[in-house]
């Protein structure tokens, strides 16, 4: 079995692969692997005022959760300086470009309390525990999931491989880059998973 994850899901795949030696291969692309680095990048993009407002909402939401009340949500993406999870200049346009034309029944928002846990989320610390082949696909101009921690994951994982692309976080989800990334990931799976099974 192979695991695949992108962005925040990439961090979950890394942690799962580190905890389960039965995984045959894993691929993480533009992965969120270091909460401290991602939080610093997010604060630079959002600015002080929006970061403060996001923190206040997160604390209020955490208190509401303790009392069993409905969550306070924040948008997943927004323009720089707004209260949202991703506010880089490319975030809103990049995110909207990958959505289906009419995503029925889904609101791109999360419970604000997640902000309180992001800095301590560091799946990169488990890279040396990943025993399966691991492909780390990194976007060199990623302002959401900083590339340097992901590059270190590829270096520290015993069977890590690194693919780098001169693009931003959302650029690998469409067009030429999608085709290139998919070709690299399929080749990785053929080498490390399918060839082993045959």
Describe the residue ranges of each PLM region.
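Catalytic histidine neighborhood in serine/cysteine hydrolases
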Residues: 155-171
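Alpha/beta-hydrolase-fold enzymes
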Residues: 12-97
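C-terminal alpha-helix
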Residues: 184-196
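Alpha/beta-hydrolase fold nucleophile elbow
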Residues: 1-7
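Catalytic histidine-centered segment of alpha/beta-hydrolase-like enzymes
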Residues: 167-182
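Conserved alpha/beta-hydrolase "acid-adjacent" motif
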Residues: 143-149
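Short beta-strand/loop motif that positions the catalytic acidic residue
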Residues: 130, 136-138
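Active-site nucleophile elbow and catalytic-triad environment of alpha/beta-hydrolase enzymes
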Residues: 108-126
């Amino acid at each position: 079995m192979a695991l695949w994850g992108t962005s925040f899901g990439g961090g979950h795949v890394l942690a799962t692969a580190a905890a389960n030696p039965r995984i045959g291969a894993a691929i993480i692309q533009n992965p969120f692997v270091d909460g401290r680095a991602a939080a610093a990048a997010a604060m630079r993009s959002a600015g002080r005022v929006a970061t403060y407002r996001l923190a206040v909402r997160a604390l209020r939401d955490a208190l509401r959760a303790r009392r069993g009340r409905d969550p306070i949500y924040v948008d997943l993406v927004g323009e720089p300086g707004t209260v949202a999870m991703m506010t880089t200049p490319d975030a809103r346009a990049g995110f909207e470009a990958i959505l289906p034309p009419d995503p029925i029944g889904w609101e791109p928002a999360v419970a604000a309390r997640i902000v309180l846990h992001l800095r301590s989320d560091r799946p990169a610390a488990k890279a040396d525990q990943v025993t399966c082949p691991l492909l780390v696909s990194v976007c060199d101009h990623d302002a959401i999931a900083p590339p340097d921690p992901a590059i270190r994951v590829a270096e520290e994982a015993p069977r890590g491989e690194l693919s780098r692309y001169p693009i931003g976080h959302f650029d690998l989800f469409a067009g030429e880059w999608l085709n290139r990334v998919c070709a690299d990931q399929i080749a990785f799976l053929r080498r490390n998973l399918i060839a082993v099974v045959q």
